[in-house]
Amino acid sequence: MDLFVFFALIWPPYVANGSAVLASRLKWRHPVDFGHNFVDGRRLFGDGKTYEGLAIGVVLGTVVGYLPNLLHPTLTLLDALILSVAALLGDLLGAFIKRRLCMPRGHPAFPLDQLDFILMAMLVRSLYADVPVEYIIAASVVTPIIHRATNIAAYILRLKKEPW
């Protein structure tokens, strides 16, 4: 496994998923689901998934996610954009599933919370480029550890209301 290629592949989704929380600092936020409920009477995604968070995640995931490629070209800027968007769609899917399971916003749901974004990014990438199985396995192993550490940091920095 080429560690630089692996890092270049997971970095845009990590940045996109991790930076979306910065929207929580904004005074006005607009939920992606506009407060609407699904047919089961529960919110589609909840107040934690906002257009502002998606925008911040896509922009930072694309730009900051692309930076390692300036040293060693592995991905294009378009790849970083696609991986960032896919990661945030994976996070939205995870929120949708959690709402269907009657889990409130912020409730921990291992491994859904930790893997939804990275697995969606890998799935979408695999639709147009080769993603070695060992990269998917490695991402599935390291992501929960990194996710936990970054969530604790975001909690300490008061960017998140809970450390998970």
Curated annotation (Swiss-Prot):
Kindly indicate whether the keyword Magnesium belongs to this entry.
yes
Name any cofactors this protein relies on. Answer: Mg(2+)
Which keywords, in A-to-Z order, does the entry hold? Answer: Cell membrane, Lipid biosynthesis, Lipid metabolism, Magnesium, Membrane, Phospholipid biosynthesis, Phospholipid metabolism, Transferase, Transmembrane, Transmembrane helix
- Identify the InterPro entries for this entry: CarS, CarS_archaea
The compartments listed are: Cell membrane
Record has Transcription as a keyword: no
Question: Reaction catalysed?
Answer: 2,3-bis-O-(geranylgeranyl)-sn-glycerol 1-phosphate + CTP + H(+) = CDP-2,3-bis-O-(geranylgeranyl)-sn-glycerol + diphosphate
Q: In which pathway does it act?
A: Membrane lipid metabolism; glycerophospholipid metabolism
Which cysteine pairs are joined by S-S bonds? none
Task: Give a GO cellular-component term.
Answer: plasma membrane
Where are the bilayer-spanning segments? 3-23, 53-73, 77-97, 126-146
Q: What is its EC number?
A: 2.7.7.67
Q: What does this protein do?
A: Catalyzes the formation of CDP-2,3-bis-(O-geranylgeranyl)-sn-glycerol (CDP-archaeol) from 2,3-bis-(O-geranylgeranyl)-sn-glycerol 1-phosphate (DGGGP) and CTP. This reaction is the third ether-bond-formation step in the biosynthesis of archaeal membrane lipids.
Q: Which family does it belong to?
A: Belongs to the CDP-archaeol synthase family.
NCBIfam families the record matches = PRK04032.1
Stated name of the protein: CDP-archaeol synthase
The taxonomic lineage of its organism, from the top, reads: Archaea, Thermoproteota, Thermoprotei, Thermoproteales, Thermoproteaceae
Please state the gene responsible for encoding this protein.
carS
